[in-house]
Amino acid sequence: MSLTRDTGLRDTGQKVPEPVEGPSRVSQSRVSIISQLTLQETWEEFLAYRLMKGRFNWHEFDEADAFVERKGYLPLANKIAEGEGLGLPTKKLVNKMGSGKKRVVYSFAPDEMLVLKLIAFLLYKYDDQFAPNCYAFRRGLKASDAVFKINKAIHGKPMWAYKLDIHDYFNSIDIDILLPMLAEMLADDLLLYHFFEKLLTTNLSISNGQIIEEKHGVMAGTPTAPFLADVYLKEVDRYYYNKGVVYARYSDDIIMFAPDYDTLQQYKDQMCHFLAQYHLEVNPDKEKIYSPDEAYEFLGFKCHGNDIDISEATKKKMKGKISRKARSLLRWSHKNHIEPEKAMKGLINYFNRKFFESDDPETLTWSRWFFPVINRTEGLKEIDHYLQQNIRFLGTGKHNKTNYRVDYEQLKALEYRSLVNEYYKSSTKE
């Protein structure tokens, strides 16, 4: 494939090439991922891994285990092996975390989603083709690794930083640009490439019960979308890695550092040029340059020297969510003549799940995302105080000093759990 002379990146104007089979292809010595979908031992390994990693609750595991035991995957796996595609995805709007905004996500039928999860699990064999500065959806790499490695790289150095967020990244990926990259990466598995080609070029979905035609990128919400999103910008990641730039990407969030403002501006201009080539847009509300004496924010963390806390943006989002949930519960309790204590208990239960123990094992709670990384608790204290205020508000209907008639012991009796206390408990366990 041709490379552009000025950037070293792929010429994105190319047509999708047909993968070429030949004696040098590793595919002849490997079993296609598509073929593995029909093997019970593959499914059993997949279920065991997800259970070990806490990505199933026991009810979900029992259902999935029964599905595998009766070989419920075989009809769909055989159809895929014969070259058939999946059904149409369903498009829906869901609330963005901590804001009143909506985002578009897609899903397939339950058995199709489970097959896509298995494919995503098996795709980790291509993990070594990504640059070390790409952290999202990598086996053995976490968001905390990005923060720790950045802090180590810039320790003691006055560095400028540029942070950006790609607008609607997953759903904006240009499939005509992605497919040649995918063809190259999956050159050893033509069956898998053709499965993705069919999946990604079917520009139909179901919205509100109606079939609509639209371009939907790699379809946010589907299990294979994170892998495809890593593939799409892997050459950009590699470009900055080869130049020795302190750089990290976690899906649509990117940050890079430079020793002076002019160099940072060059990196920024180059990144904007790359994103234009890939038909992507920067979210202007989430774009920021940090001077050397400022704390930088990335992936919900605020970092300054050796100090790591939750970011200002994270606190603002969570306060918005707490406030909206409290007002909603107050309206509900008034309308249905519910005792204030029940509304207070409802708010506590909701945020206990969000902070510590989600019903969805795929959801990253605060205790899993923030606690292993932060070493400051000011942000947690601020959220604790704000949540307590809103719990008391549900008890009195007012935001004033009368709220303190509901003392802390009453909150604890309703099973309120302090973020700060839980953080120190988790630190002691470690």
Indicate residue ranges for each PLM-predicted region.
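Glycine- and acidic
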Residues: K101-V104, P132-N133, L164, E214-T222, ...
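Glycine-/proline-rich flexible loop or hinge segments
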Residues: M52-A64, N95-Y106, Q129-N133
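Conserved pre-motif C helix in the palm subdomain of viral-like polymerases
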Residues: K101-A131, E214-Y241
